[in-house]
């Protein structure tokens, strides 16, 4: 896990990181909220994230993977940063076209990127889609790990999990 005070400050400056009383999608209460979709629409922050991710990806991957919606800008930016192609993972099966949940390369080794990890549910869903296709996932990278169970949930996959920022980095300083 990388402590990244510069990224933390950028998230605050663009108002993607807010402090106060919030109710999360899970129904849990939190004293902070991270809107990574807001951050990923800022080119400077997106470049910073992709640069940090590029330093953490294994050398031998064939493509980068990210679940729609939040991870797609991150996968695209990392692809542009590294020259490695990317794949988008659909949240559900399509009833038309190919019906595939993957758009892009689907053979070889990949790194999975995501914006925020809370309980690890969406990360596990993405992993399951990739693994069912016979894709080897070599690492999971997230921008923010809220430290609410994602690393524990994902431990059973035996795939390295790393974040740029953890919940302890986000405390109101």
Task: Locate the predicted segments by residue.
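Short, glycine/charge-rich flexible loops or terminal/linker lids adjacent to PRPP-binding catalytic cores
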Residues: 74-111, 119-124
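Short glycine-rich phosphate-binding loop at a beta-alpha junction
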Residues: 60-70, 141
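Conserved acidic residues
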Residues: 62, 108-110, 138
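PRPP-dependent phosphoribosyltransferase catalytic core
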Residues: 4-11, 128-173
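Acidic, divalent-metal-coordinating active-site segment for phosphoryl/phosphodiester hydrolysis
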Residues: 116-127, 149
